[in-house]
Amino acid sequence: MAGNEWINGYLEAILDTGASAIDENSGGGKTAAAQKGRHHDHHFNPTKYFVEEVVSGVDESDLHRTWIKVVATRNTRERSSRLENMCWRIWHLTRKKKQLEWEDLQRLAARKWEREQGRKDVTEDMSEDLSEGEKGDVMGETPVALDSPRGNKKYHRNFSNLEVWSDSNKEKKLYIVLISLHGLVRGENMELGRDSDTGGQIKYVVEVARALAKMPGVYRVDLFTRQISSPEVDWSYAEPTEMLSSSSTTAGEAHEPEEEEEEEDLGEGSGAYIIRIPFGPRDKYLRKELLWPHIQEFVDGALSHIVNMSKALGDQIGGGQPVWPYVIHGHYADAGDSAALLSGALNVPMVLTGHSLGRNKLEQLLKQGRQTKEDINSMYRIMRRIEAEELSLDAAELVITSTKQEIEEQWGLYDGFDVKLERVLRARARRGVNCHGRFMPRMAVIPPGMDFSNVVVPEDGSEGDGDLATLTEATSPRSVPAIWADVMRFLTNPHKPMILALSRPDPKKNITTLVKAFGECRPLRELANLTLIMGNRDDIDEMSGGNASVLTTVLKLIDRYDLYGQVAFPKHHKQSDVPEIYRLASKTKGVFINPAFIEPFGLTLIEAAAHGLPMVATKNGGPVDIHRALNNGLLVDPHDQDAIANALLKLVSEKNLWNECRKNGLKNIHLFSWPEHCRTYLTRVAACRMRHPQWKTDTPLDETAIDDSLNDSLKDVLDMSLRLSVDGEKMSVNESSSVELPGGEAAELPDQVRRVLNKIKRQDSGPAQREAEGKAGDVPGKYPMLRRRRKLFVIALDCYDLKGNPDKKMILSIQEIVRAVRLDPQMSRFSGFALSTAMPVAELADFLKAGDVKVNDFDALICSSGSEVYYPGTYGEESGKLYLDPDYTSHIEYRWGGDGLKKTISKLMNTAEDGKSSVASSPIELVAKSSNSHCLSYAIKDPSKAKKVDDMRQKLRMRGLRCHLMYCRNSTSMQVVPLLASRSQALRYLFVRWRLSVANMYVILGETGDTDYEELISGTHKTLIMRGVVEKGSEELLRTAGSYLRDDVIPQDTPLIAYADKGAKAEHIVETFRQLSKAGM
């Protein structure tokens, strides 16, 4: 470098603006961490800007020469000393940036090695039946194009195995669920650009809901989002339900008359709706990074709505049987996490659209070298977001992307998706070859659609110059759109071609480079105006730090280049103004530009093309595919401002090129219509493995069912005497179940009770009958007492000794909890009890028997970490017979690869950390008696060698294996159950199956427990944490360093969680239950 005067200038500028802002963490240390839970500073920080320019733009030798010069010329003045000191401090930042870059390279290399090791293991496992054709699939590259069943050949994909969705499906009457949690979602007057959470995704999900509801065969679409009752936002966001009014008929897609008549004949529940579910603080509008601890609360609220809606739709169109969702579609990571849990609870297919991805954002932020991984996680909760995306990949049947680049360069970064492995598994599945329990979601490129109803484009695209002048002069001022006046008031000559940019003032949208390109190109300034639509604002100082910084920089650049009269930047616009803005740019023969560093898709490019505007767009991301389809503009490097200026100048100066791009865009825009999008979407969804609950919800009306229903009534009577007595006596949970009925009162008993007593007197309890009752599918198993319960107390205390054996303290706690419930007559009415444990059912039964507690005292037993659900028989059965729920077994079957998991887990546990050598002795051993068809139970022989859950889950995902792995029983056991099975999910199953509301469940836990402990805390149920009952858990084996935190899973300061002191008696426990019961009101 010839001279270092520019470095000196930067250093002098830093001194002038306040060098105190520099510290060792300016490149990404405490500055970011101090902002935890907040947005960036509200004011532009020039010191930070100059420091980043020096740190990023020079090497150490330049800094060293500058320091030598400062030392040589220093004097006694304080400024010289400060300048010398600052050289040292910035040099330290430069070294730190290089260290972060080195650590990033090491991390990427480790991930690459682990990925290759996973592929190697998969190849070895499947080598015995891997064909040459499949090997070709691994090595080859299969091109991916835009999915469009009716597109032209250039963008047509092979749909030979798929039946294209058409009017022949109009009799299906489907119920579709969409989820988009963050931001401000409403159907009209969307506040797009208000904040970083309310952007293009909000518009997309609302429009896709409307469009799907108009497709043949779709009866109802529910778009779930968060209900916000905060004074910070409009009252409309607190409305629980909003019907999405139908847009006017889409251009080029007019309905036939018979279709309109058919729409009128649909039931009252048909159409598209926004359903707002309250979760998290009711009076606060939370940014998306703060929603994570409340996800399970949303899931429970959404589950309640879906169950009720399915029943209502069943009455309307399902012949009395519930109409379950055809698909549950999550948008973004938070909704993907929710959709995965809902999919598991309902056993219906899940679809995912990422919109933007956490790993991609993490990689970009780390490459900048300004923040450490810990600081990034603190600000963006990025690790929690990434785990949600990984879970979404685990559960999703189908992942919708906008571009091919998103599949290969973004989803390819995830443990749960490998492009090469997906091709192999798809080929094997197509040929009927065993995949050894491995699964990969299918990826489909389906570009977003657009509503053309507000687009008015003249058929003749050859308007001459002066169209805008003609239009504005020939009409009265009142007929000119107000937004036109707002824009034109900035411009000295508003008739020049308009260069239009429309985006949030987000740093990644690269607006400042566009302004520099415009300001430094005099021919472009002479030919065109620049219009910047940068969201809505009242006061820059009240905006988030990043947005405020961009706007401040834009204003300074306008002043630097003296662009007054050439740049328009209105403060406000409505969503309904956007078409008029495009139309204004088109009338002036302008150009639309999207200069973002990376654009996941670029919906505004499609909108602009539909209004006849050629485009200049970034070459990174979705615009590449849009340009390939429309061929209506130029692609540029967003970092090259000269290339941006030249592309804009070329389009506005060459009229023939402008007209050609305009015509191409209008000719091909139909590829991005909503009907086309929805047709392709439904075609893809129809190819998913359809699954839904298999049971029938109505009780058979034959005599046997009636009699068994009366048995349930008898059990009610017995329950009230046995364990819900309120006579004040200290009855234990295992007291006699005999009932004495005074003869004098027999005549006054209700008819149903008398029928029950007559039935029980004539009941034959012989061996043959007992044998019949033990069969799976008997009525006691089908219709247990849970259907009559209004409250359920779920005891999930993980009390074990150091050897992993159940502790007797569990028995004492059970008895004290039951006694506490009996102390409150109101609470005890129609209340039941359930046990939730890692123990297998046989061990649990023996343990209860040893403690003199009958299994009949419980309505349900959730065993083996949620892999099995049992119901006890009636109280007349002294043998304590238990009935396995066969429906639950099929409910959790999804993506369970038992044999493949068994082989891979053994291999992983017997491999040293370097991945090359084998350990001397295996740290685990499969325990057959504790395992079942959906649970692999391992004894941990050496806990110090056990790999943490995060680490094991990553390795299994990289090998295409999906499961729920946990350590339990004081880290002495590891259990592997199906992906969507868990003790927490089993509670949601009980709600779906027996209509026992999760909000009426009370979950009793210790202060710690198995590694699935955190899952049991969150939700709409009430949680009682008993101190001092569980001394040691397994949570130290849950997370690796650098993973998400407990606070990202469990909500803080919630009224739904209460504590009982160590050694608490029934009187204190019941008082805590009373407080919790008020929290749900």
UniProtKB/Swiss-Prot annotation:
Gene Ontology molecular-function annotations: sucrose-phosphate synthase activity
Disordered: annotated segments: 116-152, 239-267, 760-780
Pathway info: Glycan biosynthesis; sucrose biosynthesis; sucrose from D-fructose 6-phosphate and UDP-alpha-D-glucose: step 1/2
Assigned keywords, A-Z: Glycosyltransferase, Transferase
EC number(s) from the headed UniProt entry: 2.4.1.14
Activity regulation: Activity is regulated by phosphorylation and moderated by concentration of metabolites and light.
Biased amino acid composition, Acidic residues: 256-267
InterPro entries (UniProt xref): Glyco_trans_1, SPP-like_dom, SPS, SPS_C, SPS_pln, Sucrose_synth_GT-B1
Annotated Pfam families: Glycos_transf_1 (PF00534), GT-B_Sucrose_synth (PF00862), S6PP (PF05116)
Reaction catalyzed: beta-D-fructose 6-phosphate + UDP-alpha-D-glucose = sucrose 6(F)-phosphate + UDP + H(+)
Subunit field text: Homodimer or homotetramer.
Family per similarity comment: Belongs to the glycosyltransferase 1 family.
Stated role: Plays a role in photosynthetic sucrose synthesis by catalyzing the rate-limiting step of sucrose biosynthesis from UDP-glucose and fructose- 6-phosphate. Involved in the regulation of carbon partitioning in the leaves of plants. May regulate the synthesis of sucrose and therefore play a major role as a limiting factor in the export of photoassimilates out of the leaf. Plays a role for sucrose availability that is essential for plant growth and fiber elongation.
NCBIfam families given in the database record: sucrsPsyn_pln
Protein name in UniProt: Probable sucrose-phosphate synthase 2
Species of the source: Craterostigma plantagineum (Blue gem)
